[in-house]
Regions:
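Bacterial extracytoplasmic/cell-wall-associated proteins, especially those involved in peptidoglycan
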Residues: 1-127
């Protein structure tokens, strides 16, 4: 996928906030590239909690997901208008060299990580 330097920094800022370590960030970057390529039902939504947390400053509620904010990547396809943080070198490297996966979903906590290709698998991973 062809991206400008600015877009790479923008995506890396989201990868920075979603992953907790280098391996997770490379896998998260892969998921986001798959989503940007339209592999999620032909849509290009990032569906990132991190972009919404940038807007809310904390937890994200169901009401927040209805926001028309350009940072609401559940409602607006593609990248948000600006980076949400200054990404680390690790996040930039992960974005430039993502893992090779077909995954479209992930769930990461301090203790667990789940990556999946279908929404059904995703739901099972955190239920």
């Amino acid at each position: 996928m062809e991206m400008s330097d600015y877009d790479i920094v923008n995506l890396a800022s989201i990868v920075e906030r979603e992953g907790l370590n280098a391996d997770q960030r490379a896998h998260v970057a892969s998921v986001f590239y798959n989503r940007l390529a339209g592999k999620l039902d032909g849509l290009r939504y990032l569906n990132s909690d991190a972009t919404m947390m940038y807007v809310t400053g904390g937890e994200v509620t169901a009401d927040d997901l209805q926001s028309d904010s350009p940072y609401n990547t559940y409602k607006h396809e593609g990248l948000p208008p600006t980076p949400i943080c200054s990404p680390s070198l690790e996040a930039l490297e992960a974005t430039l060299e993502p893992s090779d996966s077909d995954d479209l979903y992930f769930y990461i906590t301090q203790d667990e990580e789940y990556f999946s290709q279908t929404y059904e698998e995703h739901q099972q991973s955190w239920n």
